[in-house]
Amino acid sequence: MTQLSVVILAAGKGTRMYSDLPKVLHTVAGKPMVQHVIDTAKQIDAKQIHLIYGHGGELLQQRLSSEPVNWVLQAEQLGTGHAMQQAAPFFADDENILMLYGDAPLITKETLERLIAAKPANGIALLTVELENPTGYGRIIRENGSVVAIVEQKDANAEQLKIREVNTGVMVASGASFKKWLANLNNNNAQGEYYITDVIAMANQDGYKVQAVQASEFMEVEGANNRLQLAALERFYQKTQAEKLLLAGVRLIDPARFDIRGSLTHGKDVEIDVNVIIEGEVKLGNRVRIGAGCVLKNCEIGDDVEIKPYSVIEDAVVGKAAQIGPFSRLRPGANLAEETHVGNFVEIKNAQVGKGSKVNHLTYVGDAEVGSNCNIGAGVITCNYDGANKFKTIIGNNVFVGSDSQLVAPVTIADGATIGAGATVTKDVAENELVISRVPQRHIQGWQRPTKKKIAD
């Protein structure tokens, strides 16, 4: 099988974005557009990915530093053909070269596989699409059904402007052919640029076949030159993802008000209310219910869990039949066992909470281990930070911590202990002990509250 390398054009400035950020770093579904393209190139087993960069190259390299790409500088942006000329020295004669665009993030693996399979032995496979309104796009010129040329909008005559089949810019040919044609490009056109589309005419002159393959959906080859187009790509992507989930059995209360910015795996009878955001890798068990306005990122949720509205869960694990929220926050390292309750305005960070334990109101539990069947009252704080270092709080099983208590770490509270409301616990507590730490209550007879003094005019 012929090896494949991919060239991704990503040197454009993106003037119409009105942004300091390079165009290809603007995001769709929480991920830079160019990252989508790189990921798709990996899916089709590209041997090498050549990334053409220019404007904002330092930031681009910084953001994509972990990607195994060959960085190719295009110092001047003189057209798509000029960009390919910069990468040509890296092409092997006997490999196929696939040309993609860093600002067209929704191209699919399936479409690219169809295109590559259609490439003639000594020719080009070209991806096209038919549009109701083709204004602005290069027109596909055919003779007897075969593609003989691509004419850019600015160079097209009146008859050519009526053509609805347009060029997407995506094509594949052999390394040897590309190197030959790229060496003969010129800029004799209205823009004074080197067009990659000119290689189509060159291929015909050499007697090579140009095979056109139509994309199944225009939006998968659409680029984003401004924020309006970027928003359209985002909506199309989200609509597509929502439809896949609906067909897989997930109930989305309103598919138009659901965003996924990563991957979601799920069990049966999952229900997701409006304005929920999924980020990173999220796993949902069976019969999970997620209330309105929740954000879930890189988390695992067990069967029969209910997440009430406006809760945020990040890098956390929630066990079966737990109840979360409303307005709860589970931060990285939170691990809740089954049948736990975490209520409104509770924050849990880097802490384990045992089976059946309840942390229901206005509480912070950080750097802690909480055993099973505990009750943590309202306003309880694990004081884990002394301004320089963090320390751990360990709470055993069947512990009751009264409201407004402070547990000053490092501290251990053994099984069955009871902490009275308002206690400040600085020393370890033994099994079944009661701790009370409060000022004795005083009663002052005849007390009168101060009254406001009137200010003279």
Curated annotation (Swiss-Prot):
InterPro entries: Bifunctional_GlmU, GlmU-like, GlmU_C_LbH, Hexapep, Hexapep_transf_CS, MobA-like_NTP_Trfase, Nucleotide-diphossugar_trans, Trimer_LpxA-like_sf. It is found in: Cytoplasm. It comes from the Bacteria. Its cofactor is Mg(2+). Residues 1-227 are annotated as: Pyrophosphorylase. In the N-terminal section; belongs to the N-acetylglucosamine-1-phosphate uridyltransferase family. This is Bifunctional protein GlmU. It comes from Actinobacillus pleuropneumoniae serotype 5b (strain L20). The lineage of its organism: Bacteria, Pseudomonadati, Pseudomonadota, Gammaproteobacteria, Pasteurellales. The gene is glmU.
